[in-house]
Swiss-Prot record:
<dbReference type="InterPro" id="IPR006461">
    <property type="entry name" value="PLAC_motif_containing"/>
</dbReference>
<protein>
    <recommendedName>
        <fullName>PLAC8-like protein 1</fullName>
    </recommendedName>
</protein>
<dbReference type="Pfam" id="PF04749">
    <property type="entry name" value="PLAC8"/>
</dbReference>
<comment type="similarity">
    <text>Belongs to the cornifelin family.</text>
</comment>
Amino acid sequence: MSWMGHHFSRWCKDISVLSSHLPLFSPMPSEDEHLISNLRSHVPARVVVKQPIRGAIGRTTVAAIVQTGGDWSTGLFSVCRDRKICFWGLLCPMCLECDIARHYGECLCWPLLPGSTFALRIGTRERHRIQGTLCEDCVVVHCCWPFSICQVARELKMRTSQLYEICEVPELKNTLV
């Protein structure tokens, strides 16, 4: 077997379409993913600045923390950083783009529309306050389409919101009289 055939066959054993699970590419979202996707609305996340009030026992606060600002977390050609996204983005970019559209609550037919990748990239950049221009996005999407989809998928995977549950500890009563 040639060098290329040896490495390709080893890679195919590691990744199979049926056994791979992309966090952004799952046929049936679990209840947790549905809860998280509902919390990811188009409204920007707010920072919790108010501390729990004394005497409010049993109240629970859920805070979503979303990383925003800065540049893209990975470069356009850093495709091999995530093997699953690389696999889906380079062999079936439409499938990966469908998954990104599902992540944003769009129809799975979204990638069939002209300019859909451009809109998804701009939406991701604006939602996470990533620096860049429309001209840069246009050039990247039209010249490096599969790489652009992979970069957006990696960005969404790295910038997913983290949920924290904040519970107030019940106050201990003084038992000494």
